[in-house]
Amino acid sequence: MDQLTSAARLMIVSDLDHTMVDHHDPENLSLLRFNALWEANYRENSLLVFSTGRSPTLYKELRKEKPMLTPDITIMSVGTEITYGNSMEPDDGWEAFLNDKWDRKIVTEETSKFPELTLQSETEQRPHKVSFYVQKDKAQDITGTLSKRLEERGLDVKIIYSGGMDLDILPQGAGKGRALAYLLKKLKSEGKLPNNTLACGDSGNDAELFSIPDVYGVMVANAQEELLQWRAANAKDSPKVIHATERCAAGIIQAIGHFNLGPNTSPRDVTDMSDCKMENFVPAYEVVKFYLFFEKWRRGEIENSDLHLSNLKAVCRPSGTFVHPSGVEKYLEDCINTLRTCHGDKQGKQFRIWVDLVLPTQVGSDSWLVSFKKWELCGEERQCCITTVLLSSKNVTVADGLTWTHVHQTWLQGAAASDSASWFF
């Protein structure tokens, strides 16, 4: 978020479970497709917001399980916690706002009188959220009775039922929709109101997102019954809210195209990357394209041919260098020559590469320094290195692509490869 000095071109606000993340997609293909699209075309001038019912603890667990990008803003615990950046700095103003007519002790006292409510795990109990499980056929009656009792005790709360079993009690000012409205107001006060905002969800606790004025919305194909019922009652004829035909992250990509919010072809959907025609030099796209080629090479999905290696050498300066995370420095061309040895070595394995936080900085009239995290996943093992790449447009055309002149990598703390010799680029 700090990299933006003006309004974001697009702000995507997405739920995680069964929206951005498809738990029925073991290869995480739709998520990886979105990742490549975002890093290649949007990261530099847009905002990615994850809005989840998960607590910080469970959110961090999900990030370890799935190949997720780092969001600019994270809204957690059903809109009761807002944090910023990779360091997840809390929004103190939002916390203070939620304290109005909220008393967690009273909520606990009143809910203890309902044996039908089963308290969720301790990690899901937050300062401004008390969470339970409840049977579907009991939810409506309990919600009505409990709301009345809490109001009589002087509280102003909202009770959200979602997922066919989850019941969350929050301050009235909380919730995913209120958190989004707060963010939009804050960005507007800073002169950075996004040009377009797209809200994405699949369950009842996402409904509020679709009621915020001037926000586009997509309910993914696998949206739950309670959200579709809300749409039928509140937004059936709205041209700004669609029910996608694609699941999860694929549905988000579909919505970007439907509303004409920007590029909607993921680099992962381009069969021949040499066919990509760009109007200008786009350093982030070059980085994404390079590592997608490397993934396909190691998975044996592209032919082991001299032509591919020649094309790779053509975008590298002959004197260009690569500093391996171990500290060893080599010429880029020598590194490319060694790729013969690893062609198809990950064939049949769950091997994926993705890049995160791709941020280009123009450091000269014809050069860019691009920083990012490069991740590799093979089975259950994942490694990551902090990478900086120096790219040049000197003596090349847009059709040729940028020239790689230097690559430098260092291991991300706690994510180093057990065998450094197996790490290429």
UniProtKB/Swiss-Prot annotation:
Its EC number is 3.1.3.24. The keyword Coiled coil does not apply. InterPro entries: HAD-like_sf, HAD-SF_hydro_IIB, HAD_sf, NTF2-like_dom_sf, SPP-like_dom, SPP_C, Sucrose_Phosphatase, Sucrose_phosphatase_pln/cyn. It is an enzyme of class 3 (hydrolase). It comes from the Eukaryota. Homodimer. This is Sucrose-phosphatase 1. The gene is SPP1.
